[in-house]
Design a protein with these regions (language model features):
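S-adenosylmethionine
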Residues: 132, 171-273
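N-terminal auxiliary segments of SAM/dcSAM-dependent transferases
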Residues: 6-105
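Conserved SAM/SAH cofactor-binding pocket of Class I
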Residues: 121-201
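Non-catalytic positions within long, well-ordered alpha-helices that form the structural scaffold/packing
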Residues: 27-28, 159, 184, 225
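Conserved beta-strand termini and adjacent loop/short-helix elements that scaffold enzyme active sites
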Residues: 72-74, 98-100, 114, 194-196, ...
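Conserved beta-strand segments of alpha/beta enzyme cores
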Residues: 33, 68-70, 96, 165, ...
Length: 273
């Protein structure tokens, strides 16, 4: 007997590029995920599939500050069908980011990411920049810190690149749980995921990954630098091109060894001298 179709709610927000960086984590708690589509160089569409629409819209208005949005109803047999239609394999440089239900065979080097649990599905320019910059750095045998790991995508790529040990941290519960799950399904054995704040960390690392927004970098850049070993490298993104000049004030004697730009965002490879 065919199952009766139920309705799924889709919420669409048109926003400026960069707004998605500041989505509160309550958004991820109330939605099956967020998908980002480019409308133009400066405009994006954020697509959500909330389980309880009224509660989600309250968070969208009161926490995220969006008051204009579209709500659509879609009849589906299975909620999972919506997710599978919305999340397809994505190529970034040499790597493919694919959802767990897609067969890895034929995709070469790939990262399995459960979509929507936390920021970091590979769709955003800052994640793409980080992955492309990471390819330019030697990871084999290195100890790596992924500060603000989100979905864990960068930690998993560090594992693929041959890192000896990776510590992935995030102070948000949903990101921590997402990274734990993604690390497990990728069997990234060298990656340890912890719910921690940057200020709680000690020790030094060969490579520090920091895909963070400018406000966090402004307040914590000295801490990030201290976590890198002498001659270690820091790979940064989450910086708007217009903010690069300000960032240069905080990097001190760090040497810039690589720069990549994409869609109004910039990323840097820095060496601690």
């Amino acid at each position: 007997m065919e199952r009766k179709k139920k309705k799924v709610f889709k919420v669409v927000v048109t926003a400026h590029k960069g707004d998605e960086e500041f989505l509160p984590y309550e958004i991820y708690d109330e939605s099956k995920g967020v998908w980002i589509e480019d409308e133009s160089h400066e405009v994006i569409r954020l697509i959500f599939y909330p389980e309880v629409p009224e509660r989600f819209l309250s968070v969208l208005r009161e926490k995220a500050g969006f008051t204009k949005y579209e709500v659509h109803e879609e009849p589906v047999k299975d909620y999972g069908d919506v997710i599978k239609r919305s999340f397809r394999p994505l190529r970034i440089g040499e790597i493919y980011v694919i959802p767990p239900w897609v067969e890895k065979k034929g995709y070469g080097k790939s990262i399995l990411i459960e979509p929507g649990m936390a920021f970091g599905t590979g769709r955003h320019e800052t994640t793409k920049i980080m992955i492309l910059l990471m390819k330019e750095v030697e990871f084999k045998g290195k100890e790596v810190l992924d500060a603000g790991c989100g979905s864990g995508i960068l930690s998993i790529y560090a594992y693929i690149l041959g890192a000896k040990k990776v510590l992935a941290i995030d102070n948000e519960e949903s990101a921590y749980l997402s990274a734990k799950k993604n690390v497990a399904i990728n069997r990234a054995s060298c990656v340890e995921v912890k719910k921690k704040d940057l200020r709680e960390l000690e020790g030094e690392y060969d490579i520090v990954l920091a895909n963070l927004d400018m406000n966090i970098l402004r307040n914590h850049m000295s801490q990030i630098v201290n976590l890198a070993k002498p001659d270690g490298k820091i790979i940064l993104s989450g910086i708007l091109s217009s903010e690069k000049r300000e960032l240069l004030k905080y990097i001190g004697n760090l040497r810039i060894e690589g720069v990549k730009r994409m869609g109004g965002w910039v990323g840097l490879i820095l060496r601690k001298t």
